[in-house]
C-alpha cells in the first residue's frame, strides 16, 4: 500500500514558519533598511530563483550568515518572506506599488502576477497612464497591455486628467499614435495634443513632433481652416505648415491623397 497525506506539506510549512518566528534553525538573516529578517535558505530558494541562485551558486552570499538586500522596503521583504512560508500575502492599494517591485527583483513570480492582476482591476481614467508606466518599468507586460487598452478606450476621459498632462514626450507620442484611440473625431486628438503642448512653455518646441501624430486629414475642412490654419504656433512652423497643407489637399484632391487617408484613418470609431 502506498500512503499519501496531502496534509503533510501544509503541516511542514506551518512548523517551519513557527521555527522561523522563534528564530530556530534559521541559517540566513536578511538585512534590509537596518532591520534583520531571519529565514531558512531552503524555503527561500524553493520559492525564488533569485535566492536559489544566491544560495547555490558561487556568490559570496552563499556562505554569509547575514545577507544585505538593497532597493527593497523592509515591509515588502517581510511580506514576501511570510508568503514563502504561508502562501498568503495581503495586497492593497497602500502596499502594491512597493510589493510588486520587490517581488519582481526577488523573483516571486506568483506574487508579481497577483499584484499585476490587482492593479488591472483598479484601472480607471485617473490612474491608467501611471499604471502603464509602472508596468513598463517592472516588466509586467500583461498589465501594460491592459492599461494601454483602457487608456485608448476611455481617451475622452483620460485626456482631461492630470496624468495626461504629465506624460513625457515619448509617452504622449506613443499615446497619440495609437490606432485604437476611441474618439468621436480626430479633432479631439488635436485638442488634446494642444493642451499637452501648452501645459508647459518649453513644450512648444516639440510642436511638429506631436502634431505629426495627429491625423489632420481626418479633421473637417472647417476645423482645419479655423483651428489649425489660424493657430500661430502652427503657421510659424514650416514643418507643421507642410502637415496642414497636406491635410487641406486631402480635402481638395481626395483622389490624389488616398494613401494618406487610408494609412491614417483606422482609429475612428
Where are these regions (language model features)?
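Alpha-helical scaffold in the C-terminal half of BTB/POZ domains
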Residues: 2-6, 10, 37-39, 44-49, ...
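Eukaryotic intrinsically disordered and solvent-exposed regulatory patches
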Residues: 13-17, 24, 66-67, 85-86, ...
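Short linear motifs in intrinsically disordered
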Residues: 12-22, 56, 123, 267-268
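Conserved AAA+ ATPase "SRH/arginine-finger" region at the nucleotide-binding site
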Residues: 68-72
Amino acid at each position: 500500500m502506498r500512503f499519501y497525506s496531502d496534509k503533510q506539506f501544509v503541516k511542514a510549512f506551518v512548523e517551519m514558519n513557527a521555527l522561523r518566528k522563534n528564530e530556530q534553525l534559521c541559517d540566513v538573516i536578511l538585512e534590509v533598511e537596518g532591520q534583520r529578517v531571519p529565514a531558512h535558505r531552503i524555503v527561500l530558494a524553493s520559492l525564488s530563483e533569485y535566492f536559489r541562485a544566491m544560495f547555490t551558486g558561487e556568490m559570496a552570499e552563499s556562505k554569509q550568515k547575514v545577507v544585505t538586500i538593497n532597493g527593497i522596503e523592509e515591509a515588502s521583504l517581510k511580506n514576501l518572506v511570510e508568503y514563502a512560508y504561508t502562501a498568503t500575502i495581503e495586497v492593497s492599494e497602500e502596499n502594491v506599488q512597493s510589493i510588486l517591485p520587490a517581488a519582481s527583483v526577488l523573483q516571486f513570480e506568483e506574487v508579481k502576477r497577483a499584484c499585476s492582476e490587482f492593479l488591472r482591476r483598479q484601472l480607471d481614467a485617473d490612474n491608467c497612464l501611471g499604471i502603464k508606466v509602472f508596468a513598463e518599468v517592472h516588466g509586467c507586460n500583461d498589465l501594460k497591455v491592459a492599461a494601454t487598452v483602457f487608456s485608448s478606450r476611455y481617451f475622452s476621459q483620460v485626456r482631461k486628467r492630470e496624468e495626461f498632462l504629465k506624460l513625457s514626450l515619448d509617452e504622449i507620442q506613443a499615446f497619440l499614435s495609437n490606432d485604437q484611440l476611441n474618439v468621436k473625431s480626430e479633432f479631439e486628438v488635436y485638442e488634446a495634443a494642444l493642451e499637452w503642448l501648452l501645459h508647459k512653455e518649453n513644450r512648444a518646441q516639440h510642436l511638429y513632433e506631436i502634431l505629426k501624430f495627429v491625423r489632420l486629414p481626418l479633421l473637417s475642412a472647417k476645423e482645419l481652416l479655423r483651428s489649425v490654419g489660424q493657430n500661430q504656433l502652427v503657421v510659424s512652423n514650416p514643418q507643421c505648415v507642410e502637415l496642414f497643407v497636406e491635410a487641406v489637399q486631402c480635402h481638395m484632391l481626395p483622389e490624389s491623397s488616398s494613401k494618406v487617408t487610408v494609412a491614417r484613418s483606422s482609429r475612428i470609431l
